[in-house]
Curated annotation (Swiss-Prot):
Gene Ontology BP, a term: photosystem II stabilization
Family matches, as PANTHER family: PHOTOSYSTEM II REACTION CENTER PROTEIN Z
Location relative to the cell: Plastid, Chloroplast thylakoid membrane
Residue ranges of the TM segments: 8-28, 41-61
Keyword presence, Cell wall biogenesis/degradation: no
Function of the protein: May control the interaction of photosystem II (PSII) cores with the light-harvesting antenna, regulates electron flow through the 2 photosystem reaction centers. PSII is a light-driven water plastoquinone oxidoreductase, using light energy to abstract electrons from H(2)O, generating a proton gradient subsequently used for ATP formation.
GO cellular component: chloroplast thylakoid membrane; photosystem II reaction center
Protein name from the UniProt record: Photosystem II reaction center protein Z
Keyword tags: Chloroplast, Membrane, Photosynthesis, Photosystem II, Plastid, Reaction center, Thylakoid, Transmembrane, Transmembrane helix
Length: 62
């Protein structure tokens, strides 16, 4: 259970770093937003889901 918690925490830290780099690149590229909108929304949604997963796993571990 602790390994799942550690992986979820690592992913919830890694995804925002990827989004911080990826979103400005998408917005700066020509025709980038219309073609990559789903990828940006998927990354943001997965980060929100990981925040809830970390909270649930934290309550199970403690």
């Amino acid at each position: 259970m602790t390994i799942a918690f550690q992986l979820a925490v690592f992913a919830s830290i890694a995804i925002p770093f990827i989004l911080v780099i990826g979103v400005p690149v998408v917005l700066a590229s020509p025709d980038g937003w219309s073609s990559s909108r789903n990828v940006v929304f998927s990354g943001a949604s997965s980060w929100i889901g990981l925040v809830f997963l970390v909270g649930i796993l934290n309550s199970l571990i403690s």
